[in-house]
Amino acid sequence: MAEGLVLKGTMCAHTDMVTAIATPVDNSDVIVTSSRDKSIILWKLTKEDKSYGVAQRRMTGHSHFVQDVVLSSDGQFALSGSWDGELRLWDLATGESTRRFVGHTKDVLSVAFSTDNRQIVSASRDRTIKLWNTLGECKYTISEADGHKEWVSCVRFSPNTLVPTIVSASWDKTVKVWNLQNCKLRNTLAGHSGYLNTVAVSPDGSLCASGGKDGVILLWDLAEGKKLYSLEAGSIIHSLCFSPNRYWLCAATENSIRIWDLESKSVVEDLKVDLKAEAEKTDGSTGIGNKTKVIYCTSLNWSADGNTLFSGYTDGVIRVWGIGRY
C-alpha cells in the first residue's frame, strides 16, 4: 500500500495571496496564516467536508502585505513580518499586537523563533539579518559587509540546539549558515543559478534544502557545509518544508506541489488543484478572481503529526491535504 495525499477541504477568508502558514507543535486544532491582504488569521479547524476550518480571529495592524508568520512553541503568540518594514508579536488569546519590532529599513520577508522562543530572527530587502529579543530590542545586525549582497528572502533557526545555528537564503543565489552564539558566518553554500526564495531545515537539523528561480532544490549537509544532491522541481520554487515524521521534502512550485521521498529521491506526489471540481464541492466559491486564472501554491506547512499538509495559494484559499493509502 502506497501513501499519498488527498484533498480534504479548503479554508476561505483571505482575499489575497496566502504568504505563510504556521502550525502548532502540540498538533491542536488551530493554524495561523498571513496574507497580502495585510491580515493574519487564527483558524479553528473543524475538519468538515465543505470547509476544513473557520476564521476565528483576524489580526490587523500592518500597513502593507504580511509576508511571514510563525508561532511560539507554547502556541500563545504569533510573530509576523511585513512589507511595512516591521515585525509584530500578537497575543492569540486577545488578537492584540503586543509588540512592534522596528529597525529594518525595507520590507521584512521572513521571521523565525528560536526553539526556546527567547530569540527572534528576521530577514529583509534591506539586505540585513537582525537578531532580536522578545522585548523588541535588536541585539545584532548582520549587514551586507559580512552577509548577503542582495535581498535576504528567508531565515530559519536550526532545531538542533546543540549547535545553535541560523540559516539564511538570498537573492544573491547563496545560502549562508551562521553561528547563533556570535553571529559569525560558518559557511556559504553556493550552487544555485538564480535568486532564492526559501530555505528549510530538516527536523533533526542535519540537512537544509534551498530553492527559488532556477527550479532546482539543492540539499546540503549543514554540519559539513557540503552539497549532497539536487532535485528537479521544474519551475520556480516558492516554499519548501520537510515532513516531521517521514523522509519527505515538499516543494510549492508554480506548476504543482511536489513531494519527494529523500531516500529513493523519487517523486511521491505531484498535487494539482482542480478548480472546477472544487467549485462544485464548495457551492461555487473559488476565492478571488475568475475561474480561468492560473493559481499556484505559495506557502506550505505540515501539521505536527505529519498527517495533514496545509497549502496556501495565490487565490487566497488554503487547501488541506491528508495522508491516504491506496
UniProtKB/Swiss-Prot annotation:
Coiled coil location: none
Repeat region (WD), residues: 13-53, 61-100, 103-142, 147-188, 191-230, 232-270, 290-326
Keyword Repeat: yes
Tissue expression from the record: Widely expressed.
Top-level division of the source organism's lineage: Eukaryota
Observed effect of gene inactivation: No visible phenotype under normal growth condition.
GO BP of this protein: cellular response to abscisic acid stimulus; positive regulation of signal transduction; regulation of translation; ribosome biogenesis; root development; seed germination; shoot system development
Assembly behavior: Homodimer and heterodimer with RACK1A or RACK1B. Interacts with GB1, MEKK1, MKK4, MKK5, MPK3 and MPK6, but not with GPA1 or MPK4.
Protein name: Small ribosomal subunit protein RACK1y
Source organism: Arabidopsis thaliana (Mouse-ear cress)
